[in-house]
Amino acid sequence: MNLLIMGLPGAGKGTQAAKIVETFELIHISTGDMFRAAMANQTEMGVLAKSYIDKGDLVPDEVTNGIVKERLAQADIKEKGFLLDGYPRTIEQAHALDETLKALGLTLDGVINIEVDPASLIDRLSGRIINKKTGETFHKIFNPPVGDYKEEDFYQREDDKPETVKRRLDVNIAQGEPIIKHYRQAGIVRDIDGNKDISEVFADIKKVIENLK
């Protein structure tokens, strides 16, 4: 079983990916882990990626695609199957993944697409506040500070401000839509309502994956 998980930042993709991997005993392939392993093992693509990172440059698509190909070519992939997380990020990377899978004799069985209302994601992602004195982190909705606090006792990181979060989501939506469309045309997308609580979302995902078998 070879799967891809997609969802906007804050949609709970990381939490659900961990549950999928544990339940179905798949290999979790996340972009960050792949890069770290390739660089640590000094693979051809890992050495190349490090040369860009050390200079502070963006790693080009062909190097990222090469790192993915190196990982998918390893023996454990055919034995166990995989869950791709964080790749592809662009439609060009999706086309490159198609070519890689074809070259390796692998198929993508399903794309788990966690859908969450962007407005609620902005609330989720922009709710983080930090106590100016203690540095403690709270969330306006999910973990509000208890006690005699005033609003001016807290500050918000630039990254967490609603307008910044909205811009980030807009970029993710613009990049993600063509990828979802590409996989819809292949008939392998399974939409999951991510507005429910974590256990309900996973129950829906589990059902979908079991039906793919």
From Swiss-Prot:
<dbReference type="Pfam" id="PF00406">
    <property type="entry name" value="ADK"/>
</dbReference>
<feature type="binding site">
    <location>
        <position position="128"/>
    </location>
    <ligand>
        <name>ATP</name>
    </ligand>
</feature>
<feature type="binding site">
    <location>
        <position position="196"/>
    </location>
    <ligand>
        <name>ATP</name>
    </ligand>
</feature>
<feature type="binding site">
    <location>
        <begin position="86"/>
        <end position="89"/>
    </location>
    <ligand>
        <name>AMP</name>
    </ligand>
</feature>
<feature type="region of interest" description="NMP">
    <location>
        <begin position="30"/>
        <end position="59"/>
    </location>
</feature>
<dbReference type="InterPro" id="IPR000850">
    <property type="entry name" value="Adenylat/UMP-CMP_kin"/>
</dbReference>
<dbReference type="InterPro" id="IPR033690">
    <property type="entry name" value="Adenylat_kinase_CS"/>
</dbReference>
<comment type="similarity">
    <text>Belongs to the adenylate kinase family.</text>
</comment>
<dbReference type="InterPro" id="IPR006259">
    <property type="entry name" value="Adenyl_kin_sub"/>
</dbReference>
<dbReference type="InterPro" id="IPR027417">
    <property type="entry name" value="P-loop_NTPase"/>
</dbReference>
<keyword id="KW-0067">ATP-binding</keyword>
<keyword id="KW-0418">Kinase</keyword>
<comment type="pathway">
    <text>Purine metabolism; AMP biosynthesis via salvage pathway; AMP from ADP: step 1/1.</text>
</comment>
<keyword id="KW-0808">Transferase</keyword>
<keyword id="KW-0963">Cytoplasm</keyword>
<protein>
    <recommendedName>
        <fullName>Adenylate kinase</fullName>
        <ecNumber>2.7.4.3</ecNumber>
    </recommendedName>
</protein>
<feature type="binding site">
    <location>
        <position position="157"/>
    </location>
    <ligand>
        <name>AMP</name>
    </ligand>
</feature>
<feature type="binding site">
    <location>
        <begin position="10"/>
        <end position="15"/>
    </location>
    <ligand>
        <name>ATP</name>
    </ligand>
</feature>
<dbReference type="GO" id="GO:0044209">
    <property type="term" value="P:AMP salvage"/>
</dbReference>
<feature type="region of interest" description="LID">
    <location>
        <begin position="127"/>
        <end position="160"/>
    </location>
</feature>
<keyword id="KW-0547">Nucleotide-binding</keyword>
<feature type="binding site">
    <location>
        <position position="93"/>
    </location>
    <ligand>
        <name>AMP</name>
    </ligand>
</feature>
<feature type="binding site">
    <location>
        <begin position="137"/>
        <end position="138"/>
    </location>
    <ligand>
        <name>ATP</name>
    </ligand>
</feature>
<dbReference type="GO" id="GO:0005524">
    <property type="term" value="F:ATP binding"/>
</dbReference>
<feature type="binding site">
    <location>
        <position position="36"/>
    </location>
    <ligand>
        <name>AMP</name>
    </ligand>
</feature>
<dbReference type="GO" id="GO:0004017">
    <property type="term" value="F:adenylate kinase activity"/>
</dbReference>
<feature type="binding site">
    <location>
        <position position="168"/>
    </location>
    <ligand>
        <name>AMP</name>
    </ligand>
</feature>
<comment type="subunit">
    <text>Monomer.</text>
</comment>
<keyword id="KW-0545">Nucleotide biosynthesis</keyword>
<feature type="binding site">
    <location>
        <begin position="57"/>
        <end position="59"/>
    </location>
    <ligand>
        <name>AMP</name>
    </ligand>
</feature>
<dbReference type="GO" id="GO:0005737">
    <property type="term" value="C:cytoplasm"/>
</dbReference>
<feature type="binding site">
    <location>
        <position position="31"/>
    </location>
    <ligand>
        <name>AMP</name>
    </ligand>
</feature>
<comment type="function">
    <text>Catalyzes the reversible transfer of the terminal phosphate group between ATP and AMP. Plays an important role in cellular energy homeostasis and in adenine nucleotide metabolism.</text>
</comment>
